[in-house]
Structures are given as C-alpha cells and as structure tokens.
Amino acid sequence: MARIKRGTATHARHKKVLKLAKGYRGRAKNCYRIALQRVEKALQYAYRDRRNRKRDFRGLWIIRINAAAREHGLTYGRFMHGLKLVGVDLNRKILAEMAVNHKDDFAKLIETVSSKLAENS
C-alpha cells in the first residue's frame, strides 16, 4: 500500500489560519500554533459581539428617543405608552431615525401623543 503524505492539506490549513491572523502583533501573525489560538479567540469575540451589537443599538435608539422626547416635555416611558394608546406601531429604530433626522415629524408625533395622554389622565 502506498504511503499517503498530507503535506498539501496541512500547508493549506496553516495558510488559511495565517491569512486570518494577518495584522496581528508579534508571533501571532506568523507562528501557526499561536496564530491558531488567536484566530479562535477572535472568532469567539466576533460571535459574542454580533449578539451584543443588537443590545447596544437598542440602547442607543432608546437614548436618542428619550433625549428628543424630553426636549418636548415627555419622558421616554410616557412617550412609548402614549404611542401605544394612539395606536402608532413604529419600532425604536424608526423613532430614533425620526428624532435625529426628521425633527418636525417627530414633533407632530409628540403633539399627538401628548394630546392623547392629556385626554386619558
């Protein structure tokens, strides 16, 4: 039976890892064993932070909506409650976009919500 050498496969695997480790500091960029550890850790961070990014953006949208609502005399919580009462079904991403880039439309929304809240209380 012929001997099978696996040098080609090993070389390709090493090359793939070292390509992913491009730009790393020290031996992590050119020493396979260290590069492999760093690349695996980088992939773990990437996986974790893809999930954290969703949390971070939601927090950012809430901060922006709260700031814009407070300019008009409402808190974030009362504003969101008012939106539910009025029946406006806009998500936080769109509301934050309106608060930053379409201030006049957001102000009209605040007026509608304020009148509904005053009517209900």
UniProtKB/Swiss-Prot annotation:
Query: What single Pfam family name could you report for this chain, choosing any that match?
Result: Ribosomal_L20
Which GO terms fall under molecular function for this chain's record?
rRNA binding; structural constituent of ribosome
Q: Where is coiled-coil annotated?
A: none
Q: Name one GO cellular component term.
A: ribonucleoprotein complex
User: Could you tell me which InterPro entries the record lists for this protein?
Assistant: Ribosomal_bL20, RIBOSOMAL_L20_CS, Ribosomal_protein_bL20_C
Q: Which GO BP annotation is one of this protein's?
A: ribosomal large subunit assembly
Q: SUPFAM superfamilies in the record, alphabetically?
A: Ribosomal protein L20 (SSF74731)
Q: List the disulfide bonds.
A: none
Instruction: Please provide the record's keywords in A-Z order.
Output: Ribonucleoprotein, Ribosomal protein, RNA-binding, rRNA-binding
NCBIfam families xrefs: rplT_bact
Name the PANTHER family for this protein.
39S RIBOSOMAL PROTEIN L20
Q: Could you tell me what this protein does?
A: Binds directly to 23S ribosomal RNA and is necessary for the in vitro assembly process of the 50S ribosomal subunit. It is not involved in the protein synthesizing functions of that subunit.
Protein family: Belongs to the bacterial ribosomal protein bL20 family.
Q: What is this protein's name? A: Large ribosomal subunit protein bL20
Instruction: Tell me what organism the protein belongs to.
Output: Wolbachia pipientis subsp. Culex pipiens (strain wPip)
Where is the organism placed in the taxonomic lineage, from the top? Bacteria, Pseudomonadati, Pseudomonadota, Alphaproteobacteria, Rickettsiales
| Gene this chain is encoded by | rplT
